[in-house]
Amino acid sequence: MIKVRTPRWINEPVAHHREGKALVVVTGSETDFWNNTFYGFRHQNGHFIAHEVSGDFSVELKFSANYATLYDQAGAMLRVDDNNWLKCGVEFTDGRKQFSVVVTRDDQSDWSVMRLRGKADAPTTLRLTRHAEALRVEIKDGKTWRLVRLAFLGMPETVEAGPMCCSPIGEALQVRFERIAWSDPIDRELHPN
């Protein structure tokens, strides 16, 4: 059974509150997580609800936002330290909603995107799973989970993970996290029949 400790904010946002079981967050101006690659800058001022989690686990998030400005983003993050982390979720680029994954190792970020269908403000469900040194990112497509990324990240036994959101160019992105569910890790099988 996994142990998820009481969370703390890393860069508390302008506003956040509960609406029933949902958590609503409003981002601050020019907030992001990115380390060096291509752009040559380092930003560590995005909003992250950091839960300490030990060992292997899965976390599932269902969320929506009023994405409108380039790079508006919301989703999940797993963090070892400022130089080693992963963030994944929806990012607004090229005028549309994309599924984005950034893996940062040794102070260098990479970035991958996948186009998503549907309205920009439609809810998205993702699952982030830790299997020892591997991180598995999946998105729910109807009733089916689709693998988006399988990545290596050197991690100690205990890491921080949880919801994340940023507005690298704009501000006041309103994100609604409808579901945040922690569980033991899903099966390691990548290609079930």
Describe the role of every protein-language-model region.
Residues 1-193:
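Extracellular glycan-recognition regions
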